[in-house]
Amino acid sequence: MFFTTGLVTDKGTVKEINQDAMMLKVAMTKEHGRIAFGLVCDGCGGLSFGEIASASYVRRMEDWFYNELPGILTNEDDTRKLDESSDNRYDPIELIKGNWTYISTQMNERLMEYGIQKRASVGTTVCMIIIIGREYLAMNIGDSRIYKYTNKKVSCITHDHSYVQKQMDEGRMTLKEAQISPMKSVLLQCIGAVGALDPYFSRGIIGRDESFLLCCDGFWRKTTPNDMVRIMNVSGYDKNSDLSSGKDLDNKIESVLKDHIEKLKYEGEKDNISAILIRARDAI
């Protein structure tokens, strides 16, 4: 796959500290060609504790990307060949899912201990995605989201862990009611603030040309469906342009994200605002 990407973060108009943290990696592998990995964390908690939580999770996942993922991709730790009952089908995506669950549980415990020491509530949401070959794996905890753009349509491939989402799932609240509810910011899952995590996973096949947008609630809350299509469509490839390096398109993506963030601030969004856009397409 060939990737064009952009990422932008802004502390917003009110908060003195940007409690969001994010990371984007694109790497060439021997076994799977180019892969892409991105995550957005939205820290919550008083003072700088939210910033600590989100940054700590991103650092842990950066360590995983460099030191643990290579072993999964090269299949060097696979022992199923010693098991005659095994069907010998190696599935790196499923192993990554297990890794992410374990790491999130580990970080949840560490941040809870830190919060106890500081006598404060410490936590962070997360949404992240990895693209390997023609497959993707997405995960979220909290209300940071991932949107997919394909065939000129946008869909959300994550599921909020929030009070209002649970009410909607159970048929007790409509979308319009959720959007104006005083409980709309209450989270039911957050790394560092719950006893047991229940990450939401989404796995799928990528077509010839698809885009993924990772964002915190400060980005998606006031973004309309038409805005989302406009933003994600900007990653479309123009055959008449010389963008073989992808650098011009990367800059264009970041410019559109920045412009939209300014629009959100003008419309009254006060939270930190962060987003990553990844376009995956067949190499030309």
State each model region's role:
Residues M1-I284:
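PP2C/PPM-type serine/threonine phosphatase catalytic domain
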